[in-house]
Amino acid sequence: MRLRKKWWARPEMEASSLVITNPKEYKGKWMEEFKNNNSIHLELGCGRGGFMQEKALKNPNINYVAVDLKDEILIYVLRKLKEKEIENVRIVPLNIAFISEVFEKDEIEKIYINFCNPWPKLRHNKRRLTHNKFLDEYKKFLKGQGEIWFKTDDIGLFEDSQEYFKESGFSIEYITYDLHKSDFKDNIMTEYETKFTSMGMKTMFLIAKLK
């Protein structure tokens, strides 16, 4: 669905200290930005920010970076954070293809990828955020033994991703084909997940650990 351009979004975002519009200048300096030594978790494709908001509220001693491309989406993330007075999140407008230019080695402890585009056509597979091409980029800044938490409702993407993780030096620590009927207790639902679970959608989930 094409988003209607919100010309007012960028000025509002640039006026907030929660939004980092020049993230490449922060490489290796994220702890300085957060003004503490807490671990940093990264969400790739944060959407409207419901997941990130809940994570940050439940874990005030963890710092979070929320990345997405469109100002038209990220402005809603910013407003959620301001409404709840959340200070342990930074919003980054960025094409994820450039993510390794933003973080230094060992700077990120955990990555969340929730319901990314499945890119089902073979010629588009390399655009998947779990493809080996992207995993190799994440390994440049993910700590040893760091984790990627991955959720999807697309069976093809889920099964292909298991192979991508294994080929890229990750071990699968947890996996379920029906998250909401599993024994996993630490799930926070995204807006998409909430809507479509009520319509019968099954969510698949895995935790991959960097060896």
Curated annotation (Swiss-Prot):
Alphabetical list of InterPro entries matching this protein: SAM-dependent_MTases_sf, tRNA_(Gua-N-7)_MeTrfase_Trmb, tRNA_methyltr_TrmB_bact
Binding site for substrate: 121, 153, 190-193
Transmembrane segments annotated in the record for this chain: none
Top EC category: transferase
Keyword terms, alphabetized: Methyltransferase, S-adenosyl-L-methionine, Transferase, tRNA processing
UniProt binding sites for S-adenosyl-L-methionine: 43, 68, 95, 117
Purpose of the protein: Catalyzes the formation of N(7)-methylguanine at position 46 (m7G46) in tRNA.
Xref: HAMAP family: tRNA_methyltr_TrmB
Protein name, per record: tRNA (guanine-N(7)-)-methyltransferase
Annotated organism of origin: Clostridium tetani (strain Massachusetts / E88)
Underlying gene: trmB
